[in-house]
Amino acid sequence: MSRLPSSRALLPTATALVAFVSSAAAQPAPIGFQSPSKNIACQLFSIDNRDWLRCDIVEMATTPKRPADCDLDWGHAFEISARGENAARICYGDTVIDPALPVLGYGDIWQRKGLTCTSDQAGVTCFNADRHGFSLSRGKQDLF
């Protein structure tokens, strides 16, 4: 007849499982937003004590040619730091598109850590404290 393990034998496994579930649940929610059309999504990241905003656009009228030094995807991702950096189109292998992000309604403003974004029917515009940024829409993507 088979015996079930004692509760003492199960305790280490149960403790490890609770610790794993607790650490997974402790992950912070993404900080960002998506446009009402869900064509554009942006998320804030802190890397090496610097704050960065990354925005991805799903559909564009045209896709720019990928540079030779980019082995990943090109054209749909943009980033800007909170200070001192120009905005850039980036080479990427992932996405910040997340249907769980809150919607930034038309006419609304999103501000975090020196970064500001506005949403209107034409698209999304984001800039930093130095007024460097980008405007994204299906029709065109401008860096400034």
Where does each model-flagged region fall?
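Bacterial N-terminal signal peptides that target proteins for export
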Residues: 2-13
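Bacterial N-terminal signal peptides
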Residues: 12-21
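Sec/Tat signal peptide C-region and signal peptidase I cleavage site
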Residues: 22-27
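Extracellular glycan-recognition/adhesion modules and their associated mucin-like linkers
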Residues: 28-39, 106-112, 116
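N-terminal secretory signal peptides
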Residues: 29-70
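A low-complexity, Ser/Thr/Gly/Pro-enriched, surface-exposed linker/loop concept
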Residues: 54-104, 136-144
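Acidic, glycine-rich flexible loop segments
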Residues: 93-127
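Extracellular glycan/ECM-engagement signal in secreted proteins
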Residues: 118, 125-144
